[in-house]
Amino acid sequence: MGLSGKNVIFVGGLGFIGYEACKQLMAKNMASFFVFDVLDKPENIKALQALNPKTKVYYTKFDITSKQSIKSALADVVAKVKYIDALINGAGILTDPNVELTMNINLIGLINTTLEGLPLMDKNKQGRGGVIVNIASVLGLEPCPPAAVYCASKFGVMGFSRSIGDPYYYNITGVAVVTFCPGLTETPLKNNIGSKYTFEYSKKISEELNSTKTQKPEVCGAHLAQVVESHENGGIYISNQGTLAKVTPTVYWQPTYH
């Protein structure tokens, strides 16, 4: 799906990977670009707008842990531009000692934003179809002992995204669901692996993991922008060490419908 003339929302667009992706997306000649974030960085919003005057950039102060904040922010988008064509869910933290906050931001908030946004995009309701890109992690595909809680949240994102990305839903709504899985990327979140781990015993392997090869946020952001345009329902992509690759998950069981 080309983004020219489209209305796009990026939740968590002022983080490191998110902001780099936002800069890439500004080259796509979107009609409107809504950046939702708890961070307030007016200079970054101005910098985005300066990249392409053809795209109107909006900033919304956003609390992903609040259903009311989610509902109000999405309603404001519809009031301004009528249609939502792409929704990117990119808010995330890595702080295993705080289980509730990790789950509320990484998983529950993403679920609530998706469930609130998808009906607004549904071609059978008030939308015209589109794409939702949920940002999971390579740690949503494989376990990582020093970040067990973070892993659990991202495994949840993966299961949720694959479920609502079923062709059954896509054929009805016209809304594709794609999952994007960054590998280790040079951001403060990556650095938290070495300090905000699951157990005291995790320190050694956390530090070892934190010292392995990474990629720049600019590279990961460019990959994310590419995935947003793919519009491939059910697609799962890994961005790791500078390479973007499609993933085909192993299927152990499939539901049978009668």
From Swiss-Prot:
Stored InterPro entries: ADH_Ceratitis-type (IPR002426), NAD(P)-bd_dom_sf (IPR036291), Sc_DH/Rdtase_CS (IPR020904), SDR_fam (IPR002347)
Enzyme class, spelled out: oxidoreductase
CDD domains for the chain: ADH_SDR_c_like
Keyword hit for NAD: yes
One Gene Ontology CC term in the entry: cytoplasm
UniProt KW Methyltransferase keyword: no
E.C. designation(s): 1.1.1.1
Catalytic activity: a primary alcohol + NAD(+) = an aldehyde + NADH + H(+); a secondary alcohol + NAD(+) = a ketone + NADH + H(+)
Active-site residues, record numbering mapped to chain: Y150 (proton acceptor)
Residues binding NAD(+): 9-33
Keyword tags: NAD, Oxidoreductase
Pfam families reported for this sequence: adh_short
GO MF annotation, one: alcohol dehydrogenase (NAD+) activity
Domain of life: Eukaryota
Residues noted as binding substrate in the record, renumbered to the chain: S137
Assembly, per entry: Homodimer.
Family designation: Belongs to the short-chain dehydrogenases/reductases (SDR) family.
The protein's name in its UniProt record: Alcohol dehydrogenase 2
Source taxonomy: Eukaryota, Metazoa, Ecdysozoa, Arthropoda, Hexapoda
